[in-house]
Design a protein with these regions (language model features):
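Hydrophobic structural segments
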Residues: 1-371
Length: 371
């Protein structure tokens, strides 16, 4: 039996949520972690058409790239399109999971796919991933409840180290306490002293998940006042951020003009038209790209002739021209339309692959057209 929590853990193993940007909101957006899953629909983003397809196909989980929920929701009702979509998913017991900038920055994901298409050599991440604060959380829990508390913490992102999930240390010990007269103890009675066989449970947790993990700990722990400690680690967990970065840069197989590079991009990614700034006859040897919206990173460009990305504005093109860098707007959708396939392949290649039916949403398209 595969659960939503199992799939989230596997996705986190491949695309650690710790490596998401601080403003991002990946992870489980809707649904119960213990819900069973045998059908998963992957999509770039959640749309009414994707919701309808998930319901029609009988999916129990929709796995998207773009998180549907970015900001706190004040109301969820059928007065808004967003509310209706979430209600439709909830009423059909369909969970919603997202892997966004944690996927964008991961090795062997979209950056590698686009670099392979361009046949880049001498590759390296265009933007190295900045490490985020890591904490160790230590909680003391009765031996009989240790697994329940551990699973609740894992479900909120604790215990992810590199390519491993559900990582913890457990040691046996003895807890001692005296119950106050106004207490409501799970073990013992008010006014008595108790000695309990307990487990010391330790896990690492990222700064962005710390609040959710401590909340889950409180909810799952049998004690009225759980005893736990949180320590900030002075060194980052090895292997978690050193291989991660946004985009890729590298050398083309052979120098070509900007005009020829544009024609090549249109052909390999099936793009009818695109926008670009720069001298069409200039020679281009080393290029960089950032899938999605990466024009804000022009100032980070060093030693490249052209930057390929999407969602470029007037001032982005002007900035690139001033810096002597060709800027190619290949489109947000066009540079990310392969991600649902990457998500689907990740599921099929996982330990749960034989237990899951995975389908890529058919109703995906660029939200706008060029006339």
């Amino acid at each position: 039996m595969v659960t939503v929590c199992d799939i989230r853990g596997m996705v986190c193993q491949k695309f650690p949520e710790k490596c998401a940007e601080s403003w991002d909101n990946p992870g489980l957006q809707l649904g119960r972690g213990d819900a069973r899953v045998n059908r998963v629909l992957t999509a770039l983003e959640l749309t009414p058409a994707v919701v309808a397809e998930a319901i029609s196909w009988g999916a129990q989980l929709v796995l998207t790239h773009h998180p549907f929920i970015f900001k706190p929701i004040k109301v969820m009702n059928d007065d808004t399109p967003e509310g209706r979509m979430l209600l439709d998913l909830a009423e059909h017991k369909i969970a919603l999971l997202a892997a966004h900038t944690n996927l964008d920055s991961a090795p062997h994901a979209i950056a590698e796919k686009l670099a392979d298409d361009l046949e880049l050599c001498n590759r390296k991440p265009f933007l190295s991933h900045e490490p985020y604060a890591t904490y160790k959380i230590v909680v003391f829990v009765p031996k009989t409840d240790a697994e329940t508390v551990a699973q609740a913490m894992h479900a909120k992102g604790a215990g992810c180290v590199g390519q491993y999930t559900n990582v913890s240390f457990r040691g046996c010990g003895t807890g001692h306490f005296t119950c106050g007269q106004g207490s409501h103890p799970a073990i013992g009675t008010p006014g008595t002293s108790e000695t309990v066989e307990e487990i010391r449970l330790e896990m690492v947790v990222s700064e962005r998940d710390l609040r959710a993990v401590t909340r889950a700990l409180h909810q799952a722990h049998p004690y009225e006042e759980p005893a736990f400690d949180v320590f900030k680690l002075e060194s980052e967990v090895h292997g978690l951020t050193d291989l991660y970065g946004f985009g890729m840069e590298g050398d083309l197989p052979a120098p070509m003009t900007l005009r020829a590079l544009i024609a090549h991009i249109k052909q390999i990614w099936d793009i009818p038209s695109l926008r670009a700034a720069g001298n069409a006859d200039q020679m281009v040897s080393r290029v960089a790209f950032v899938n999605g919206a990466g024009a804000k990173f022009i100032s980070n460009a060093r030693g490249i002739d052209a930057l390929i990305t999407g969602d470029c504005g007037h001032h982005d093109f002007d900035n690139a021209i001033r810096r002597g860098i060709a800027l190619i707007d290949a489109g947000h959708y066009e540079t990310e339309k392969y991600i649902p396939q990457i998500l689907a392949q990740t599921l099929m290649d996982s330990a749960f692959g034989n237990e899951l039916e995975v389908q890529i949403a058919r109703e995906m398209r660029n939200p706008f057209e060029v006339y």
